[in-house]
Amino acid sequence: MKIKAIGIDPSLRNFGLVVAEIDISNDDYPFEIKDMMLVQTESSKETKKTVRKNSDDLRRAKILHDGMMHMINKHKVTFAFVEIPTGSQTARAMSSYGICIGILSACPVPMIQLTPFEVKLAGTGIKSATKHEMIEAAFTEHPEAKWLMHKRNGEMVLKESNEHLADATFAIKAGINTDEFRFSAGMMRNAFLATHAEKI
């Protein structure tokens, strides 16, 4: 039995979304990446002097929300594994944090919340893993995924923006190891088996 889940690495500028298919009939819960999307937004430069900052933030929030909902609806996901952003000391960073929390609150499927440390540990086993280490680990574990690439010195190499997709990927890996997910997956598996047993 397989289900779809989405990993989310949220930020106002780069919102990483990764959809995976998880085999919940296997106690190890192996998963394969089926789709990924990096939704990027920037402050409006053309209208900087004519549009209020909060109006521009609303525009950007809608873009991110629509991207999240598109992936959830397109793949009919069952769970969301989310690296919850932490607060910051600057007012602007806190504003971005609040926007991301608001977008996540609109997620229509059950959400398993994860810390940045949990995600890094799931990816590399190191709490202080660098973005390059996370990207390399994600690419090595999931070569089937459509990672963002560009040409450098005549060779195709991974883009640094894969950082957000790598974090979303390892949010899934961290999430499937939580008691919360394993309990829910077990209930779903038992319900599936019971339903099919009745038909035999």
Kindly give the residue locations of the regions a language model identified.
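Phosphate- and other anionic-substrate recognition elements at nucleic-acid/protein interfaces
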Residues: 1-200
